[in-house]
Swiss-Prot record:
Residues 1-10 have a biased composition (Pro residues). It is found in: Nucleus. May be involved in transcriptional regulation. The gene is ZNF581. Keywords: DNA-binding, Metal-binding, Nucleus, Repeat, Transcription, Transcription regulation, Zinc, Zinc-finger. Residues 1-52 are annotated as: Disordered. The keyword Coiled coil does not apply. It holds the Pfam family zf-C2H2_4. This is Zinc finger protein 581. It comes from Homo sapiens (Human).
Length: 197
């Protein structure tokens, strides 16, 4: 992988190209449609071209990555039909099936919050998060779903359903390693990490 010039001399999150590459890449099952795909192309035998991708480093500075798709494949996998590359985040090593997913994920490592609420000034990394935030400025505080058993109100029906377990005592999330049950899936995940590593 080759890093091309960016607004700063080198992305601050990485000290070298080797540290950007992260763990070894793996090969997935199906071909990825996109700029380097030869599916449905009359030039299926032409050599692959390097592709440019825009990512964002941990300081929010965009930088371009040049990826030669063929050289990034695992040894022995280049001739295997129906296999494609998966992309690994250079910051956290999380693996993605498509480069577009990696690009979307890269904003999570940035401190830049370009979407600002015009009412209160709170800023967000994603437009969808700003849209959800706008509901708090609606009449009633943007919490139309009220609990019938207590005065609490919620933005959406899913939050109300999750809260209702407090009153019902329902614990739908069973630990696969022990008899404990949990009201929320994230609590089960925390339990599993701590008690059953």
């Amino acid at each position: 992988m080759l890093v091309l010039p960016s607004p700063c001399p080198q992305p601050l999150a990485f000290s070298s190209v080797e540290t950007m590459e992260g763990p070894p890449r793996r090969t997935c099952r199906s071909p990825e449609p996109g700029p380097s795909s030869s599916i449905g192309s009359p030039q299926a035998s032409s050599p692959p071209r390097p592709n440019h991708y825009l990512l964002i480093d941990t300081q929010g500075v965009p930088y371009t990555v040049l990826v030669d798709e063929e050289s990034q494949r695992e040894p022995g996998a280049s001739g295997a039909p129906g296999q494609k590359k998966c992309y690994s985040c250079p910051v956290c090593s999380r693996v993605f099936e498509y480069m577009s997913y990696l690009q979307r994920h890269s904003i999570t490592h940035s401190e830049v919050k370009p979407f600002e609420c015009d009412i209160c000034g709170k800023a967000f990394k994603r437009a969808s998060h700003l849209a959800r935030h706008h509901s708090i400025h609606l009449a009633g505080g943007g919490r139309p779903h009220g609990c019938p058993l207590c005065p609490r109100r919620f933005r959406d029906a899913g939050e109300l359903a999750q809260h209702s377990r407090v009153h019902s005592g329902e614990r739908p999330f069973q630990c696969p390693h022990c008899p404990r049950r949990f009201m929320e899936q994230n609590t089960l995940q925390k339990h599993t990490r701590w008690k059953h590593p």
